[in-house]
């Protein structure tokens, strides 16, 4: 199983989209970076979980895996939901484009399920307004 290829298929398009915004929005992944402590700036936190990673196939040249993708958008609290919703729209557009990508002959083929959310939350203590979406995914690594 090629976990890094699956992560890259999800992470790279999201990272590119948020880095292309003006100003660029920092993205933190659960596998390589940590969110800065006590930050009041906006940022995106992406978590990828693996569920079934040994789904049987008819060929040894194909690996199938399933899991979940959770995207949290953190924006400055007290400024309204508009910026958070704009960043969530960026994430949703990327996820929808992944479902419209043709199946390659080699590499990683990714399909996402229904997108849940957005849901919004904030606490009295935290400096952020948080928007969240999540979805299940199915990946096929073709060799």
What spans do the regions from the language model cover?
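Residue-level detection of beta-strand scaffold positions
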Residues: 14, 48-50, 66, 88, ...
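Small/polar-rich, solvent-exposed N-terminal microdomains that initiate assembly or binding
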Residues: 1-61, 98-106
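Short, charged, solvent-exposed linker or helix-capping segments at domain edges/interfaces
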Residues: 57-59, 83, 143
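Short, well-ordered turn and helix-capping elements at secondary-structure junctions
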Residues: 50-54, 77, 116-119
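Oligomerization/assembly interface segments of phage tail-like spikes and tubes
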Residues: 61-79, 128-140
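Mid-chain, well-packed structural core segment of small domains
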Residues: 74-92
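Conserved acidic
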Residues: 2, 6, 83, 127
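Acidic-leaning, charged glycine-interspersed low-complexity segments
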Residues: 92-143
């Amino acid at each position: 199983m090629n976990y890094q290829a699956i992560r890259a298929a999800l992470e790279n398009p999201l990272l590119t989209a948020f880095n292309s915004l003006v100003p660029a929005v920092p993205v933190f992944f659960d596998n390589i970076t940590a969110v800065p402590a006590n930050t009041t700036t906006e940022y995106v936190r992406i978590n990828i979980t693996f569920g079934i990673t040994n789904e049987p196939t008819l060929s040894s040249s194909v690996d199938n895996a399933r899991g979940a993708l959770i995207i949290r958008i953190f924006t400055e609290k007290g400024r309204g939901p508009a910026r958070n919703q704009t960043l969530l729209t960026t994430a949703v557009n990327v996820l929808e484009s992944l479902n419209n990508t043709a199946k390659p002959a080699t590499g990683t083929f990714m399909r996402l399920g229904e997108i849940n959310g957005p849901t919004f939350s904030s606490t009295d203590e935290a400096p952020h307004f948080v928007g969240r979406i999540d979805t299940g995914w199915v990946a096929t690594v073709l060799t």
